[in-house]
């Protein structure tokens, strides 16, 4: 419907042509990606990249890749408007820092779980958490798991020593 009204000349110009104050041609490269009802989208892209550069980039790409390219340019332009110095690199860096903090918290929580399981198994030797232990299955032929057997499972925890854990996060 949009294309048919554009052929008749009754359609409103796209956001790019409106901002650039020019007539929106039927074959306007901007119109499929910058609709008239989203003027800020093109305004940011124009401010960061320039209309001529955006036009060149879109002309060089196959039609099926243009939507993704515009989406990327809009994201990068919005990030640059929010953070003029770092742009999207600042957002990526911030997210990477959050990942690093969360991974450290996860490692501490996993180390705490291992620490609590070891302490529980030493305090209550007959009530281990392992389903293969004789006390939990009641079968004398069950294999008993020794701490050496679990060494491979928690080998990545060797870097966390008990002294660095401090007090338990969940202690009262």
From Swiss-Prot:
Tree of life domain: Eukaryota
Positions of the UniProt region annotated as Disordered: 125-152
Disulphides: none
Biased composition (Low complexity): 131-147
Record domain LOB: where: 12-113
GO BP terms, alphabetized: phloem or xylem histogenesis
GO molecular function terms listed in the Swiss-Prot or TrEMBL record: transcription cis-regulatory region binding
Tissue: Expressed in young shoots, roots, stems, leaves and flowers.
InterPro entries in alphabetical order: LOB
Family classification: Belongs to the LOB domain-containing protein family.
The protein's name in its UniProt record: LOB domain-containing protein 4
Upper taxonomic lineage: Eukaryota, Viridiplantae, Streptophyta, Embryophyta, Tracheophyta
């Amino acid at each position: 419907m949009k294309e048919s009204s554009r052929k008749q000349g009754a359609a409103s110009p796209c956001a790019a042509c409106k901002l650039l104050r020019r007539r929106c041609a039927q074959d306007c490269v901007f119109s499929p990606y910058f609709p008239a009802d989203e003027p800020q989208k093109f305004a940011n892209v124009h401010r960061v990249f320039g209309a001529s550069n955006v036009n060149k980039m879109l002309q060089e790409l196959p039609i099926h890749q243009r939507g993704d390219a515009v989406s990327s340019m809009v994201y990068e332009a919005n990030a640059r408007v929010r953070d003029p110095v770092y742009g999207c690199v600042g957002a990526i860096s911030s997210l990477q820092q959050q990942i690093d903090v969360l991974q450290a918290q996860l490692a501490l929580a996993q180390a705490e779980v291992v620490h609590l399981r070891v302490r529980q198994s030493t305090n209550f030797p007959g009530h281990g958490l392992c389903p293969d232990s004789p006390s939990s299955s009641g079968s004398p032929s069950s294999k008993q798991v020794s701490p050496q057997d679990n060494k491979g499972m928690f080998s990545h925890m060797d870097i966390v020593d008990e002294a660095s854990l401090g007090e338990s996060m969940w202690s009262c």
